[in-house]
Amino acid sequence: AASDVYKRQNVKITVGNRTITATMEDNAAARDFLSRLPLEITLNDYNNMTEKIFYPDPALTTEGVTRGCAPTPGDITIYAPWGNVAIFCKSWSHSNALIKIGRIDGNGIEVLSIAGDIPVKIERR
């Protein structure tokens, strides 16, 4: 089936000379994100290194996508009210406003768990 192509889409995130990978969810928001790749963006530090965020332009679709997520380190989410993508470096309480679109593999989140803004390149694997 056509949808099988999206079951486990992987992306590569390059941070300086280091590369980490992430596995995307099978939902409309994740598919919209994948359609934008490759992306060269700056992840901004938010909430004292709890998350790294950026604002896709235009915002990713959230139509028909299940909301609600209790993020743990490595989760890639959309904060629906603002439309920003938030990659969590720390665990956070459950929020109905969060939509999970993927997860950084293994302990790759350590590469992003640093202070300040981080330029990254995101592309399909």
Predicted segments with their positions:
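Short, small-residue-biased leader/transition segments that mark boundaries at the very start
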Residues: A1-Y6
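Glycine-rich active-site loops that engage anionic ligands at enzyme catalytic sites
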Residues: T42-R125
